[in-house]
Amino acid sequence: MNKKIKQILLLMLTRNTLYFILVLFGLSFSAGVNAQSRLYPKGREHSQGPLKRYHEKIDSLLLNNGKLDDFAFTIEPSFEGEQGCYYDNETSELVLKVVNKNIWYSAKVEVAEYRCSISRSTASLIEELFSAAVLSSSYLAQPNGLDGVTYEVLINGGYYTAECWSPKKDTNCHKLVRILEELSAAVKINDQVAVENLIPEIKELTTVFKELCDCLFV
């Protein structure tokens, strides 16, 4: 093999290596960006074993036995008691259920229930936000970790779901999590005004997630 051919092969190898590195970097960067901006799609139907039983307990204890009218969300700490909140279409109430111990580690738990009436228009805005968040979810988003809090959003009666895990501050998911936490706090004290005060944030974040939805179909 002459010197010129060796140089050409070396150049090709260098270019291919560089391209491979750039591809890996691009995927890593993309995953990082998505982890900050989107939820992660969650397919409960694929759960098996202990995880499946855990989801069944969540539905049974916190989400009206899985019989949901419209939208819902859960807050699932790694070690503390979980929360589930869903919309009761018949009474136009947000229903929050909280357990005193972590369901994963406890055979028996106590459930506390709280209710807060909201207007139909407010319910529609919350549903619109949740729908945009779930439909813009991406498998590139980081799904979860070992220690923290998992937040799950459910729409269409729980048919579609997506989640995030302890998102970083000032990200889209963190803004969504803040709304979930504020909704939970408002329902606990039956404060309809506090729910209504979240409307500007809800509308703003809905627009952001809808723009991410549009990106998926460009």
Question: How would you describe each model-predicted region?
Answer:
Residues 1-40:
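Bacterial Sec-dependent N-terminal signal peptides
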Residues 36-218:
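Function-determining sites in protein domains
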